[in-house]
Amino acid sequence: MARTTPIERYRNIGISAHIDAGKTTTSERILFYTGVSHKLGEVHDGAATMDWMEQEQERGITITSAATTAFWSGMSKQYPQHRINVIDTPGHVDFTIEVERSMRVLDGAVMVYCAVGGVQPQSETVWRQANKYQVPRVAFVNKMDRTGANFLRVVEQIKTRLGGNSVPLQLPIGSEDNFKGVVDLVKMKAINWNEADQGMTFTYEEIPADMVDACEEWRQNLVESAAEASEELMEKYLGGEELTEEEIKAGLRQRVLAGEIIPVCCGSAFKNKGVQAMLDAVIDYLPAPTDIPAIKGINPDETEGERHASDDEPFSALAFKIATDPFVGNLTFFRVYSGVINSGDTVLNSVKDKRERFGRIVQMHANKREEIKEVRAGDIAAAIGLKDVGTGDTLCAQDAPIILERMEFPEPVISVAVEPKTKADQEKMGLALGRLAQEDPSFRVHTDEESGETIISGMGELHLDIIVDRMRREFKVEANIGKPQVSYRETIRTRVNDVEGKHAKQSGGRGQYGHVVIDLYPLDPEGPGYEFVNEIKGGVIPGEYIPAVDKGVQEQLKSGPLAGYPVVDLGVRLHFGSYHDVDSSELAFKLAASLAFKAAFNKANPVLLEPIMKVEVETPPDYVGDVIGDLSRRRAMVNGQEANEFVVKINAEVPLSEMFGYATDLRSQTQGRASYSMEPLKYAEAPKNVADAIIEARKK
């Protein structure tokens, strides 16, 4: 089979935004205008095509990033047909892992902002992730029809809050109820959409007289941005010559791909205005797979390798999402970076060093699927029934193994105990949790050794609620959940030297003997978390026992002496000890090390660390006093507030343990008008009274 769409005409894009900026509605409109779905799905009535898990439709938020393929030839059919793979990413902070993971496999992103709310807390998180993976982006200011909409304010916020060099491609004609259309600053024409056919058709018209001056001024800004792309464009521009439409677009494209500017469009997805022009911007300015640098990887001999976006290179792909589908079982979404895969081929999972046979391959359109025979470089598809592929694994040709970059996943901050309501469900619950953990690396399951309880951990209350909910719906397991547990940590504040640990049992027969002397010292919280320094001189402890000392200490780190929480940010220096020719063993040195560590830890001014969350509350001005008062009762440190006439943003740092049930309390204080987001910020020392209470409770 030959390629149906040349790789230059592919666009792999993510659509990401803050909750409620209207991202799913925007994705829906893309599917509608590109001719894939014939009925518009509205999030309000729970029928949006992209939000396909039942809970997403109930809660009206997007949880799983569905990948969908759509085709586009431009508003005026001005391009050959392009193929756009759209990845819809969640905007809720508990699902940041999904966003991070999809950023890995995207080439470009559309950032959706609300014309009223502007750049909101989650927008900043998503922006940082896009920077981390150097993803070129365009912005779409949505909800221009809402009261309080202000396009230029959002353009300004992209500069001041995110540090993005925003360049408007359009200006809105009217706003709020009078929002009629947009002026295209490249063509210098007004675009009006036809409301009778849901905006499928539109007309180019003259710019309204009262907008001509503003449009001239902003066009100047646009042309200048384009001219900065190259010396020849700059010379032409400074020489007073007009740049052609092609030159302006080429200049802007070059600068977007270099990450220097963010073109901004506007519209109202709900009112069917502006989405097609935004799709044109995706084709004009966002990269094809061939425009981005080759993906780097690691060859089997640990040297660096790379794969270019070409069908002729060996096959390589990254599995970026595992989803459980009620009809076909496991769906593994993957992005092909190089080469071609056909159904029936066997490939290597180079991370686990196992072979996998590709059976059926499907291309997803939200939750409908079309079976295909092959997938080529630059494309995204899903495979059915792969046996042992996890998120972030590399799939590659058996004769050309490579491991593409590994993804890094955050540590969970909150845990709850779960137990099935009936004994019969015990095994089913284990299976269900295992399957869900395979799909979502930011979710962990383990059994508490002391209590025997099953503990699930994740990125926030909502994250765990949804896991329990999915167990009920998809696996028919009813479970009771305990009170949330916070992941505390233990560390030390002062250095202690020359603490010894001795394990000796020498009463006839083969004895046990190990003896170590260590120093214990604090490490910087930004550092490695733990280090072990061996400074044994003259063989007072033989080399083969040194790893046992390290191991003995590390086993103690899992459950600290204060309250049984993990120990972090300390170093151990082993500098003296003794051994016995016959009685010494690895086990004896391991035990000696653990005794020395416990003794040293208790002398080194041990403290309990608690997770601190970065919390941002947005509230109408009337409730600011109540909200701040309540935050102070939760031991918050309020760092400041920003206000406009509609909303006040309060930034605070709050211990996670004080944030349980906050959503409900905030709703009742503000009659449901405030919202908040939180993300893990750091660990900090817990005040003595708090620490004492926690340690006391753990002893019971």
From Swiss-Prot:
Transmembrane segments: none annotated. It comes from the Bacteria. The keyword Transmembrane helix does not apply. The keyword Ligase does not apply. It is found in: Cytoplasm. One of its GO terms (molecular function) is GTP binding. HAMAP family: EF_G_EF_2_B (MF_00054_B). NCBIfam families: EF-G, PRK12740.1-5, small_GTP. Belongs to the TRAFAC class translation factor GTPase superfamily. Classic translation factor GTPase family. EF-G/EF-2 subfamily. Catalyzes the GTP-dependent ribosomal translocation step during translation elongation. During this step, the ribosome changes from the pre-translocational (PRE) to the post-translocational (POST) state as the newly formed A-site-bound peptidyl-tRNA and P-site-bound deacylated tRNA move to the P and E sites, respectively. Catalyzes the coordinated movement of the two tRNA molecules, the mRNA and conformational changes in the ribosome. This is Elongation factor G. It comes from Pasteurella multocida (strain Pm70). The lineage of its organism: Bacteria, Pseudomonadati, Pseudomonadota, Gammaproteobacteria, Pasteurellales.
